[in-house]
Amino acid sequence: MSKTFKAIRDRTYSGVGDLIKLLPTGTVFLFQFLNPVLTNNGHCLLINKYLTGVLIVICAFSCCFTCFTDSYRTRDGYVHYGVATVKGLWPDSSSVDLSSKRLRVGDFVHAFFSLIVFSVISLLDANTVNCFYPGFGSAGKIFLMVLPPVIGVISGAVFTVFPSRRHGIGNPSDHSEDDASEMK
């Protein structure tokens, strides 16, 4: 391997590492665990391409869906999860006022940018690149190096403007102040 390729690879991994912080960790772990197996470490047959495509679609859906999930604690102390709707969380709870957890514009912004970030991570993964577009030239390698940090900066700025207060599946909050004020 040439020094240039190693430097590009290292910068790409560094940029991808920063982007991963913006996504659900379980989804990213699942992708990183299964992608080398499904792509045959980048040496794909047609079936490998289909299976990898399905994995990418499922993980992308998961990244978007988790932006619309939230959790709450009931009076009995149990944490429950739900999906944000226009009226609050579904399924509804009779012991907690969930109207403050209704759908917001920021949820759609987070879902869109989570999809963008996951797309960059999944489609620029070394195994995915070798599988789907093995003839990536030198211009493509520059693209691999530049795109993750650019998307990371843009997404980070957008996530700063639209902070998420959701504590979805796998991310329960401490619920100390939020749910105490929501009890009926």
Curated annotation (Swiss-Prot):
It is found in: Endoplasmic reticulum membrane; Vacuole membrane. Involved in membrane remodeling. The chain crosses the membrane at residues 19-39, 45-65, 105-125, 142-162. It is a multi-pass membrane protein. The keyword Transmembrane helix applies. This is Protein DMP2. The gene is DMP2. It comes from Arabidopsis thaliana (Mouse-ear cress). Keywords: Endoplasmic reticulum, Membrane, Transmembrane, Transmembrane helix, Vacuole. GO terms for cellular component: endoplasmic reticulum; endoplasmic reticulum membrane; plant-type vacuole membrane. Coiled coil: none annotated. Its main location: endoplasmic reticulum. It comes from the Eukaryota. GO terms for biological process: abscission; endomembrane system organization. Expressed constitutively in leaves, stems, flowers, siliques and roots. Belongs to the plant DMP1 protein family.
